[in-house]
């Protein structure tokens, strides 16, 4: 649903397909090719996010998901974006892009989650980054969100996730921006 709202609003995203069964997921992969990323529709910390390099890997991972709760029978298949070995996490509070960090992949891992060994460093908020993040927040009717973006080698900046219960510990640690304080001030202003 988030992906559709972003596309409707003209926010750049990786190409994606949603499948509601093992057979339709495998058919989509045959049609669109590899590599692909398969993600749960709800989750955090990169858990259950896998890179599918071929049909054998796809069949094994999708078969495992089919044995789980029905929510995991929704297969969100996303293009594998060729990019630098990092992504960007930006915290948006109301109409303020508060801070951002680069999350660098660790130990050759394609995932950028810092708890998997990645590192974080400050990301300058450019006008382009600010515009995309505000547009993305508005597209999903968000107020306080974490937006994850990738710098695609082909498409430029693309939004690959929006978190309405975002983690911000590393953003605070790296940038020194008081995200909890900004959130509190924003919420008090809404009262």
Residue ranges of predicted features:
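A short glycine-rich, hydrophobically flanked beta-strand micro-motif that places a catalytic Asp/Glu
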Residues: 78-79, 88, 142-154
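Generic beta-strand structural signal
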Residues: 18, 92-93, 151
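Short strand-connecting beta-turns/loops that link adjacent beta-strands
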Residues: 43, 95, 152-155
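Short, glycine/acidic-enriched loop or turn micro-motifs at the edges of active sites
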Residues: 42, 82, 149-151, 164
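C-terminal active-site "lid" helix and adjoining low-complexity regulatory extension at the edge
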Residues: 138, 151-191
């Amino acid at each position: 649903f988030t992906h559709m709202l972003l596309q409707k609003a003209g926010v750049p995203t990786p190409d994606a397909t949603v499948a509601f069964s093992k057979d339709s997921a495998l058919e989509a992969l045959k049609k669109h090719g590899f590599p692909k990323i398969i993600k749960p529709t709800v989750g955090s910390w990169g858990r259950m996010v896998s890179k599918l390099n071929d049909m054998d890997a796809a069949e094994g991972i999708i078969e495992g998901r089919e044995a789980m709760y029905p929510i995991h029978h929704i297969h969100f298949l996303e293009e594998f974006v060729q990019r630098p070995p990092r992504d960007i996490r930006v915290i948006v509070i109301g109409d303020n892009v508060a801070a951002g960090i680069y999350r660098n992949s660790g130990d050759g891992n394609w995932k950028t989650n810092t708890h998997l060994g990645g590192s974080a460093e400050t990301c300058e908020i450019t006008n382009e980054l600010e515009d995309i993040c505000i547009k993305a927040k508005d597209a999903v009717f968000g107020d306080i969100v974490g937006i994850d973006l990738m710098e695609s080698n082909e498409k430029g900046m693309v939004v690959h996730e929006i978190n309405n219960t975002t983690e911000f510990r590393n953003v605070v640690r790296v940038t020194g921006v008081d995200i909890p304080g900004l959130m509190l001030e924003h919420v008090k202003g809404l009262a």
